[in-house]
């Protein structure tokens, strides 16, 4: 599985919704798929799975609002 697919799998697991795999441009916050508690859980999951740390203080919701944006941000941090 490539990195992008792994990110989508982790995201789907945390969101408990496969729509993030089916529609990578869906706004996960606008659609209520992920809330602030879920965001913290997601960042911890990324740290655990990929050893990528995203400080919550540097988390900009507008830059992380879709699966494609999340993949882009994580690729930049790798």
UniProtKB/Swiss-Prot annotation:
The keyword Cytoplasm applies. It is found in: Cytoplasm. GO terms for molecular function: D-alanyl carrier activity. GO terms for biological process: cell wall organization; lipoteichoic acid biosynthetic process. Residues 1-78 form the Carrier domain. It comes from the Bacteria. The modification O-(pantetheine 4'-phosphoryl)serine is found at residue 36. NCBIfam families: dltC (TIGR01688), PRK05087.1 (NF003464). Belongs to the DltC family. This is D-alanyl carrier protein.
């Amino acid at each position: 599985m490539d990195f992008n697919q792994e990110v989508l799998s982790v995201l789907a697991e945390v969101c408990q919704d496969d729509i993030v795999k089916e529609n990578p441009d869906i706004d996960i916050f606008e659609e209520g798929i992920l809330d602030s508690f879920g965001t913290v859980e997601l960042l911890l999951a990324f740290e655990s799975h990929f050893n990528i740390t995203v400080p919550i203080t540097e988390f900009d919701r507008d830059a992380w609002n879709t699966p494609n944006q999340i993949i882009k941000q994580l690729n930049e941090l790798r």
